């Protein structure tokens, strides 16, 4: 009796795209605190990257709104930062999907993060 191994298709190499200008937002707090983030996205299809480029203003808008709703306490831990990263990735995928674009952005990375 032969057991067939499921062959996975080799994945395309990753394509990284920077959302360029840092995101700088005031945090939701009584004091004057801000968050600065630099973001890179990863996909394996140039069509996805092209959709990100085309809709960059809308993506930046939605991400700015998401980030400005955070409090210093909510992102002071590694778990909080990871939750924010996952929420940002879901927002990018949602925006692209709502626009009927390919939404297969696989990862979102914070390449810099400063909170003051």
List each model region and its residues.
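Flexible, low-complexity charged segments
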Residues: 1-116
């Amino acid at each position: 009796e032969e057991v067939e191994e499921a062959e996975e298709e080799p994945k395309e190499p990753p394509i990284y795209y920077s959302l360029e200008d840092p995101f700088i937002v005031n945090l939701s707090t009584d004091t004057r605190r801000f968050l600065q983030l630099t973001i890179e996205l990863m996909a394996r299809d140039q069509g996805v990257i092209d959709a990100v480029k085309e809709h960059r203003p809308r993506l930046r808008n939605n991400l700015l709104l998401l980030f400005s709703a955070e409090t210093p306490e909510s992102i002071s831990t590694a778990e909080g930062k990871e939750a924010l990263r996952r929420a940002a990735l879901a927002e990018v995928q949602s925006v692209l999907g709502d626009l009927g674009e390919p939404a297969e952005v696989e990862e979102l990375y914070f390449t810099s993060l400063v909170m003051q």
